[in-house]
Design a protein with these regions (language model features):
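Active-site-proximal alpha/beta segments of enzymes that process anionic O-linked groups
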Residues: 7-137, 145-152, 239-273
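Glycine-rich, phosphate-binding/catalytic loops in enzymes
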Residues: 16-21, 158-161, 209-213
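Flexible glycine/proline-enriched surface loops and loop-helix/loop-strand junctions
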Residues: 60-61, 109-112, 153-158, 201-203, ...
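A long, amphipathic alpha-helix that forms part
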Residues: 118-140, 147-204, 543
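Histidine-centered active-site microenvironments of extracellular/periplasmic hydrolases
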Residues: 194-233, 278
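Phosphate/adenylate-binding glycine loop and adjacent helical scaffold
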Residues: 265, 269-375, 397, 401-410, ...
Length: 918
């Protein structure tokens, strides 16, 4: 019986009081108890593989977890079938996909539809009564998902956990009682194994390497297990999850899976006669030694292998002495225990070394990918510095060689090394062949650099000049981005990356506050010499939106605007002469305070994630009313901001209706309170679908109105033309508003409040503070990227897979649809980065589209945004992939480096999609 996400403390800790029958068995000495540690990644499919094969799955199984295929590797389930055992299975359908045609009877349940935690377990339990009276099966496997789904929805502290554990305890009692009755009439006793596949983080998710995610209980029950010592919860034997496969194989008289790395638990073999126990350990050690010989070249001189040889010799000597027991005075059990200890040391030593070195990597593919990323980085740098890149002329010969090396050779090499006619010369693994193969790829990046720097010999000089002319704030944005990238070379900085972004964001906020405070003070004490906030020195390189302007043109525009109280590019849009400079000081100070509150909203990272935070306090059952009021106020705040930015009455009403729908969706889930409604919580699918319907209606309305305005536009109709420009300039802001409420629908209830604060900060930044700072478009892009990354961590995300909110993928769904689920999860996870990027485009569009030459300037600004975004992704990817490839055998490769690489890859995919849409 496997209970998904069953943490060790749910059985052995304080929560064990909710499983009274199980605890009574533990304390009466009627069970064998272990703590089984799982290797990361702690997601279901890799854990099932580990339980069945005794091996350590790779991190690619995190992706394959959503689409499991047949397991080809030797495993315990296949050995059961080959031995003629009849197996029945009920529960997570991942087992059915991994082991097709293995089960005599099955009833699979979908493991990914996390909003259901009742029906999914009932569909398993309904078969138990009938199966316990059947005698046509030998092995029954039950996989319960309800506890895992509750964790994803509400966390381990939810009031739903207690009744679920009581429900599981009642099932354990039913099965154990029935098996004890059957054993009274059977020759061989039954074995009941209770375990978990992984644990559950304090946020309710899993996938990472924290103790709460990796530590699970293993309890063995049988009519033959009696009179054990009273359990000491502080001294429970610890094993690895991969040890379960060889342990069960030996207890059931089956061959151990060929590639198992597990070592049978001595505690599980404790009840066997000493001769049988030593024989079982010999079989396990022999199997491990076979794997060891295949994977450790110097095994003959290795201490672990020599220990195995000594254990074999001691075992042989023990058997000889046992045969001469009548002639020689010996204590068979005492000597046998010494032999068992030698076997155990040999097994644990070989297991540890194999586990740390067994991973195999395609070095050629790794190097190829790294070099291609560096090519992209160099190319983007070149394009960013040389803004006339669109008219750059490259010789035909250079272009042909570049294409051949970039596409032709890698394709040919891939086909050669993966096809049936594999070439040992190109694809071998010895030093000479690897050198010949990888040397070609090194030539590839050298050629790329040669083409780039020979086509523009002044590139470095131009880039240096462009840096020297930037403002201190722009330099800080550039140096901070580069500094953050190199900070990723430290595992501690990766684990606590949120601290870097919090520091950067608050530094920007303080710079803005100091800037406006200085201007306000200057205006107060020198009213006659007040400097306009948008003006800069004449030698400034370029202002926000001034990309590519010559000094003469910039001076001309300043002269034209010298008599105006508005910025030269916003004159006519609003009345600026009456603006109080202290207004910007107040807004800047509010941003600083709000971001400090957000810093404490969700503790994340590794070292301090366990500390209590505002979110933990709000999700407590006794704080439901407080959360309800805060969610309502937050939704009202978002609606007010949207009403300020939109004049269209239909939009205003639709967005207000969507906000109400979001609240009722959370009320249906039981997260917030609505008086007289939703006495029994449900998944809120209908409420969420109503919100989706409103969004669809808004999109259709916008599209039809856009078509109508464009069709009725006449060249001589200046009024229509002006309206069309205004309408076009507001399109990104409309998308931004829809995206805002989609995010509010998907995030956890307490994060609705956090995201409302992010919306408030974005409104102040975009509409009031930054437009008056004359930042270049590239600097604006970096600033918005910084705020987006900080918001990513404000949501409670981290570089651990455990913080991914799986439940967001099922909002409004009645059935399992992997495409929609993946899209919703991506939106919820990367809500803040996407939100800020769309906000950036909204600001640029509103600024340029209404101007006389606005279309050309908007296109130029869009190119700047795309190049800067590309660089902001290519730089960390190029650096970090080198680190990940070099440290692929590091202790933290699975717990730190690999999850971060997955996050970087997914963030890059979303950024590329955004660039393509632009």
């Amino acid at each position: 019986m496997l209970i998904d996400a069953l943490r060790a403390d749910f059985v052995f800790g304080d929560a064990g009081r909710w499983m009274p029958y199980t605890r009574r068995l533990l304390e009466n000495g009627q069970s064998l108890n272990f703590i089984a540690k799982a290797h990361p990644p702690t997601v279901t499919m890799p854990r099932i593989k580990a339980l069945a094969t005794g091996g350590i799955p790779g991190f690619v199984d995190v992706v394959l977890n959503f689409d499991s295929s047949e397991l080809q590797e030797d495993n315990l389930i296949t050995q059961l079938r080959h031995s003629g055992r009849k197996i029945i299975f009920y529960g997570d359908d991942t087992w059915i996909r991994l082991f097709p045609d293995h089960f005599q009877r099955t009833d699979g349940t979908t493991s990914f539809f996390v909003t259901d935690y009742t029906e999914v377990d009932y569909n398993v339990s309904r078969h138990i009564d009938s199966e316990l009276v059947n005698n046509d099966w030998d092995v029954m496997i039950l996989h319960y998902l309800g506890l895992d789904h509750i964790g994803h929805l509400a966390g381990p502290g939810s009031p739903l956990v207690q009744p679920k554990l009581k429900e599981m305890d009642a099932i354990i009692q039913k099965i154990h009682t029935a098996l004890n009755k059957q054993d009274a009439y059977q020759e061989q006793p039954s074995l009941f194994v209770l375990c978990g596949d992984h644990g559950m983080s304090d946020q309710g998710s899993h996938g990472g390497a924290s103790i709460s995610e990796t530590v699970t209980p293993l309890v063995m029950l049988s009519s033959q297990i009696k009179g054990q010592k009273r359990i000491d919860y502080e001294k429970i034997e610890e094993i690895y999850q991969i040890d379960i496969a060889p342990t069960l194989s030996l207890l059931l008289g089956l061959p151990i899976p060929q590639n198992s790395l597990g070592a049978a638990s001595p505690g599980a073999l404790h009840g066997l006669p000493i001769r049988m126990k030593l024989h079982a350990m010999q079989i396990n050690t022999h199997q491990l030694a076979k794997v060891y010989r295949q994977n450790v070249p110097s095994y003959k001189s290795d201490d672990n292998y020599l220990m195995y040889k000594r254990a074999l010799g001691a075992h042989s000597e023990w058997l000889r002495l046992l045969a001469d027991e009548g002639k020689v005075e010996i204590d068979p059990k005492h000597l046998g225990d010494k032999v068992a200890n030698q076997y155990l040391r040999a097994m644990t030593g070989m297991r540890g070394k194999l586990a740390s070195s067994l991973s195999k990597y395609d070095v050629q593919a790794l190097v190829t990918g790294v070099l291609l990323l560096w090519m992209v980085l160099l190319s983007l740098l070149h394009c960013h510095v040389n803004r006339d890149i669109m008219s750059l002329e490259v010789s035909t010969g250079s272009l042909a060689v570049f294409i051949a090396f970039s596409f032709g050779f890698p394709t040919a090499h891939f086909v050669t090394c993966t096809g049936p006619n594999r070439s040992d010369l190109l694809c071998g693994i010895d030093l000479l062949r690897v050198f010949l193969s990888l040397g070609t790829y090194v030539a590839l990046i050298i050629l790329t650099g040669f083409i780039i720097f020979t086509t523009s010999r002044k590139t470095i000089v131009q880039y240096y000049k462009s840096l020297s002319s930037k403002t201190p704030l722009e330099l800080f944005l550039i140096l901070g981005t580069v500094g953050h990238t190199f900070s990723l070379l430290s595992s501690s900085f990766v684990e606590e990356e949120h601290q870097t972004w919090y520091f950067f964001m608050q530094t920007i906020n303080l710079i803005i506050l100091i800037k406006y405070s200085a201007e306000a003070a200057h205006a107060y004490y020198n009213p006659s010499r007040r400097k306009k906030p948008w003006e800069k020195a004449e030698d400034s390189s370029k202002g926000f939106g001034g990309s590519g302007l010559s000094n003469r043109e910039r001076r001309r525009r300043l002269r034209q605007s010298s008599s105006s109280e508005c910025p030269p590019e916003t004159s006519g849009e609003s009345s600026c002469e009456s603006v109080n400079p202290w207004k910007f000081v107040v807004l800047s100070f509010i941003c600083v305070c709000v971001c400090r509150i957000l810093r404490s909203w969700n503790q994340t990272g590794d070292k301090w994630a366990h500390l209590p935070d505002v979110g933990d306090w709000l999700v407590r059952p006794e704080q439901k009313m407080v959360l309800s009021y805060l969610v309502a106020v937050s939704l009202m705040l978002v609606v007010i901001i949207q009403w300020i930015t939109h004049q269209d009455q239909f939009y205003r009403v639709a967005l207000a209706g969507a906000a109400i729908g979001v609240y009722f969706f959370r009320a249906a889930n039981g997260a917030v309170h609505v008086s007289g409604m939703y006495e029994n919580s449900n998944n809120g699918a209908k409420e969420a679908q109503a919100v989706y319907g409103l969004f669809a209606l808004v999109i259709i309305y916008t599209f039809l109105w856009y078509i109508y305005v464009k069709m009725t536009l006449h060249q001589d109709n200046t009024e229509h033309g002006a309206y069309f420009k205004t309408f076009s300039s507001t399109l990104p802001r409309r998308v931004h508003s829809i995206l805002t409420l989609v995010i509010m629908l998907l995030v956890r209830p307490h994060n609705i409040v956090a995201f409302a604060m992010i919306v408030l900060v974005e409104y102040f930044i975009s509409m009031h503070l930054v437009p008056r700072m004359n930042l270049s478009v590239s600097a604006m892009t970096l600033l918005y990227v910084w705020f987006g990354q900080a918001g990513f961590y404000f949501q409670g995300n981290s570089n651990s897979l455990a913080t991914v909110d799986v439940s967001a993928g099922y909002v409004g769904l009645d059935s399992y649809n992997p495409g929609i689920i993946g899209m919703l999860m991506a939106i919820a996870t990367y809500a803040s980065p996407v939100f800020w990027l769309v906000g950036l485009i909204s600001v640029l569009c509103e600024k340029y589209v209404g101007m006389q030459d606005g279309e050309e300037r908007y296109i130029a600004a869009t190119y700047d945004v795309c190049f800067t975004l590309g660089l902001s992704r290519a730089l960390p990817l190029a650096i970090y992939t080198v680190l990940a490839a070099a440290l692929r055998y590091h202790l933290f490769v699975w717990s730190v480096f690999s999850p971060k690489l997955l996050y970087e890859g997914m963030c890059s995919v979303i950024t590329i999609i955004f660039i393509v849409l632009l």
